[in-house]
């Protein structure tokens, strides 16, 4: 006599989860507000760029700042042809290009940084940049840039 195997329920198939979508300008949509987020000891912040003040420095340059205790994240919007004049600062800088491209003059070299690429700039290293096309740049500074926070960065406001 043949042994019967127990009835098994059909295998349940899991739905494949959707891959995380890439960051697009839709995610970075701007809304004008008056919030200037800054951290104080032990404060947790959860923000959308649309909640962060958009500051216009000149007709070709705008930025948003999120300031932490030891680091600052900035979203910089540059129109094609915008020049960031030669300058240096005591802050270490990481520049991540979300959209567009920036040409940097730094350490005796010209470096073009495209969307998806990162440039690290050590403290006190003079540098200049030009937007080769409309560009969205995320800059991280350690420590936070006091001249940007208190708006004494006249080299950008021309």
For the regions a protein language model found, what residue spans apply to each?
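Ligand-binding loop in jelly-roll beta-barrel domains
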Residues: 123-147
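Conserved short histidine dyad/triad with adjacent acidic residue
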Residues: 57-59, 74-88
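Short, conserved beta-strand element in jelly-roll/cupin
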Residues: 77-79, 89-104
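A cytosolic small-molecule/anion-sensing beta-strand core signal
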Residues: 98-99, 114-115, 133
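Structural motif
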Residues: 94, 101-103, 110, 126, ...
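A short, N-terminal "cap"/entry segment at the start of jelly-roll beta-barrel domains
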Residues: 1-70, 153-158
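Short acidic-glycine-tyrosine-enriched beta hairpin
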Residues: 108-123
């Amino acid at each position: 006599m043949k042994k019967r195997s127990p009835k098994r329920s059909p295998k349940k198939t899991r739905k494949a989860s959707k891959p995380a979508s890439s960051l697009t300008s839709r995610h970075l949509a701007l809304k004008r507000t008056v919030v200037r987020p800054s951290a104080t000891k032990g404060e947790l912040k959860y923000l959308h760029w649309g909640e962060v003040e958009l500051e216009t420095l000149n007709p070709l340059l705008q930025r948003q700042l999120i300031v932490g205790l030891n680091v600052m994240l900035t979203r910089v919007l540059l129109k094609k042809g915008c020049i960031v004049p030669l300058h240096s600062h005591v802050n270490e800088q990481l520049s991540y290009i979300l959209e567009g491209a920036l040409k940097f003059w730094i350490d005796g070299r010209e470096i073009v940084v495209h969307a998806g690429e990162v440039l690290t700039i050590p403290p006190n290293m003079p540098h200049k940049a030009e937007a080769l096309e409309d560009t969205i740049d995320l800059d991280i500074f350690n420590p936070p840039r006091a001249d940007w926070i208190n708006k004494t960065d006249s080299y950008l406001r021309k």
